[in-house]
Amino acid sequence: MKITRLGWTAYAIAIVAIVLDQISKAWILATLGTTPGASQPVFGPLYLTLVHNYGMSFGLFRGTELARWALTIFSAAVVIGLAVWARKATRPLMAGGLGLIIAAAFGNNLIDRIRYGYVVDFIDVSRLHFPWVFNVADSAITLGVCLLLLDSLLSEEKKIAHPDGHGL
């Protein structure tokens, strides 16, 4: 199957987001070391706090070694499914959303879990009553899902406005 131009865009977005995620994690480990709990204020409520996340995004579903590998295998399947979907991307928001979600699943759940056995989290805004420490990939998946939802809403509005498919 041919990959659309927006499909290639989704893949490019994924690569850039993976690189940014991994660079940020390498930098944080070089800055704070590898001991969980190491913390440094940045400004206002923003702190850099190293957390070894054995669960999913925002520390959800922490568990055993079996959970680690189950999440890794599940993430690989998600990456493959999203990569196939991205090949057919026809709308910019869809391409952007898929690229960001692919990056998050690949960067967090494949690279980190295989490399470290956990995900490196470090963005800490708990002083704003947001209890989870997260990373660039967590932000990417959140933004990616928002883009897909927005894409879905906008494409549904077009279908309602032009039910016969004309005028698109």
Where are these regions (language model features)?
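Alpha-helical transmembrane bundles and membrane-interface segments of multipass inner-membrane proteins
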Residues: M1-L168
